[in-house]
Amino acid sequence: MAQKKGGGSTRNGRDSKPKMLGVKAFGGELISAGSIIVRQRGTQFHPGVNVGVGKDHTLFALVDGHVSFGVKGALNKHMVNVTPA
């Protein structure tokens, strides 16, 4: 006979890995073309001058330069720009 009861089962025991979201390059920072500026879900930050958008809403620099953040419009949208160095 068994000396211990069976272990049973659980439906827990899994978790998703971290997504590493957030601002990667801050205002005034010098970055190169193709560098990621913001990784985000949705468009919390919108692309401005010399900034591109990836399919997962990642913002990246199109030219070498300095990053700047600001707000625009009546809805105060957060904009990200890159001014060429």
From Swiss-Prot:
Tagged with keyword Ribonucleoprotein: yes
Annotated Gene Ontology cellular component terms: cytosolic large ribosomal subunit
Biological-process GO terms, alphabetical: translation
UniProt keyword terms in alphabetical order: Ribonucleoprotein, Ribosomal protein
The organism's place on the tree of life at top rank: Bacteria
Cited Gene3D superfamilies: 2.40.50.100
InterPro entries per record: Ribosomal_bL27, Ribosomal_bL27_CS
GO terms, molecular function: structural constituent of ribosome
Cysteine-cysteine disulfides: none
Statement: the UniProt record of this protein carries the keyword Transcription regulation: no
Family: Belongs to the bacterial ribosomal protein bL27 family.
Annotated NCBIfam families: L27
Identification of the protein by name: Large ribosomal subunit protein bL27
Organism: Variovorax paradoxus (strain S110)
Lineage: Bacteria, Pseudomonadati, Pseudomonadota, Betaproteobacteria, Burkholderiales
Protein's gene: rpmA
